[in-house]
Amino acid sequence: MGKLLAICTSPKRGTVKTEVPSAVLTPEWGIVEDAHGGNWHRQVSMLSAEKIEAFRKKIWVDYGAFGENLVIDGFDFRNLPVTSRFAIGDVVLEMTQIGKECHSDCAIRRQTGDCIMPREGVFARVVKGGTIHTGDEMKLLPTPADLPLRAAVITLSDKGSRGEREDKSGPLIVQMLTAAGYVVEETMILPDEAKALKAQLIRMADGRQVNLVLTTGGTGFSPRDITPEATCAVADRNAPGIAEAMRYHSLSITPRGMLSRGVSVLRGKTLIVNLPGSPKAVQENLEYILPSLEHGVRIAAGLDGECARK
């Protein structure tokens, strides 16, 4: 059980928020008249009161100084998994991300040289709307047993990132994942740059805590093909069987299947798999691995037991 100590809003992003006694929350939008409301995954930001109190030992800050919407006493949000649900009266919030990248013009960082929001803040979407008031109780709700697996899709393409080439592989992956029962939380097109890819893989695994990340492109022999190296750089454990199975299947179709350098790894509880860049190869590989992939994804997430056959 927690307690809502403060509600804070602002009309502009990148600024401190100011306390208000109550707020109206709208489903799939956020707090009415707050700058961060919208149809995205970071509708409401939350900070544990204990984290703010620890910061206040160095320098005094008001509630809302870190851009947080809700200050809650009694919960250490960083120790709870993404998809955790909370009730404040009739309002239901679902946690969607832990931490974030702090932009350079963050007001509190300019003033104090530090901002705890990237380390300690969490974000949520509004599942059920209503009105909340300072002093309300917050309850942690049981996690629904039938939550679908969550995925993200990253396309690697210099030309695609510049809008010079249509991305056909990314939408195909989304279509196939959706048909298999996954919820695709995010899609993006990145240039073939290791730094950008590593940052997004880390964010997807650590911040969004998706169960599966599928990349497409950048697995060949071109000097700009850096997807396997960037993927291995963020990995905790190797999961080579998936990539090996895809190469084996591709070789049954074309001898050029041996030229794929794609890898499959684990970062925390997230499985990351490199797919080829062409839509044809994407479809062939996904059709081959998807039926067996779910069990491995669920084991990595702690949702299923061992793989041993009986």
Predicted regions and their residues:
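Electropositive, beta-rich accessory/interaction domains or terminal extensions
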Residues: 1-92, 97-99, 131
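Solvent-exposed alpha-helices and their adjacent loops that cap or buttress functional pockets
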Residues: 15-18, 36-39, 78, 115-118, ...
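Short, structured beta-strand/loop micro-motifs enriched in basic residues and often containing a Trp
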Residues: 65-75, 114-127
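Mid-chain, well-packed structural core segment of small domains
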Residues: 74-108, 237-264
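Well-ordered alpha/beta subsegment
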Residues: 121-144
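Glycine-rich phosphate/diphosphate-binding loop of Rossmann-like nucleotide-binding domains
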Residues: 146-192
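N-terminal small/polar loop signature for handling phosphorylated ligands or for N-terminal nucleophile
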Residues: 176-178, 184-215, 220-234
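Proline/glycine-rich low-complexity loops and linkers
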Residues: 227-310
